[in-house]
Structure formats: structure tokens, C-alpha cells
Amino acid sequence: TLPVIFETEAMTSLFSAFTGLWNGELLYKGISCLKDKWNEKILSEKITIEDDPRNVEALTIANFDDEGCPTRKKVLVKDGVFVQALHSTKSASCMQTESTGNGFKSGYASTIGVSPMNCCIVPGEKSLQQLEETMKDGLVITDLQGLHAGIDFVTTNFSLQASGYLVKDGKRDRSVTLITVAGNFMDLMKKVEEVGSDLDWSYH
């Protein structure tokens, strides 16, 4: 198997499909696979995940959620360890904790649920070019399709159509299209060796 780099837009698409793993309501109901993983190492130590509705660099910011609770920056995963979930007042009450300011409506007429806002993997220090040079030979995935049909949230399995390009001797070689990328999101994130530096909020 080839080493793989997920370019920012592709990883954002895949990551966004699984942000519900840290949803307090889904944890309480036992739907999230992290329900018994508190304070355990669940991902690579290279990965820290934050949720920050007040991030001024993001496209959307909120000082309060739709329940009137103040928002704040939360660290959900620290160096690969699951440390915190997202909560509305309802999910917080069920789990005997406090709201994290993540009680939002998905639409005007919808009910309030737990939702992330500006949730991201904290960027590393290497650029995409540096990652390609380090990898030497491998595949860079730039786009993923079929996220609605190819994702199993409960098992975190995925099978998606992808496109990108091959890297040979640390340099871009040729484009590839209509390939299938399949695996398990949690297993994938456990094997991450580096996180790129090019976080782009326009994709969120």
C-alpha cells in the first residue's frame, strides 16, 4: 500500500462527516463509538482537535449558542487522547455536566441539538510540499466524493470515490481519478504521522 496524504479540502470533508463522534447526545445514547473511551488514547499523538465558535479566522463565529449559553474554545482531543465532548444543556444534564455552548439549531424551525462550530484538527508545522518531499513516493488525495452514501458513522467505515495525484521521488508525478479510497476513520487517524500546516477556514 502507498503512503497517503489527504490535502486540506479532502481531509476537511472526511473529518466533518465524523465530528458527531464528540457529540454529547450521541455519546449518551451510545451511538458514538467513543462512549467508553474517556481519557483514552484514541488517535495518533500528532492529533489535537479543537472546537472554537469564537475563532475570528473562521467564516462563522458565535459568542452564544441558540440556548443563550456562552460559547468557548474546547479541546476535544489532546495529543490523541479523548478529553471532552460537546454539549447542549439537554445533553449536559443527561451526562451530569455543564453545557459547552454547543446547543444550536440546524434551521429556523428545527429543534436545538448538539452541533460543533469551527471544529478542526490543530495544524502542524510542515507545508504540503514538505510532506510530499518527506513521503517521497505515495498518493495525495485532493477530492472525495460520495460522502453521503459512503460513510457509516456507527462503525466509522468509509468507501469513497477520490481523485488526486501520485508523488514520485518527492515531486508531483501524474493525476489520478476515479479511484476508491476505503478504510476506517478511527484506524486512519491512529496512523497519522504528520499534520500539515495549511489549515484553510474557507473549507469549513
Residue ranges and their predicted role:
Residues 1-204:
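N-terminal small-residue-enriched
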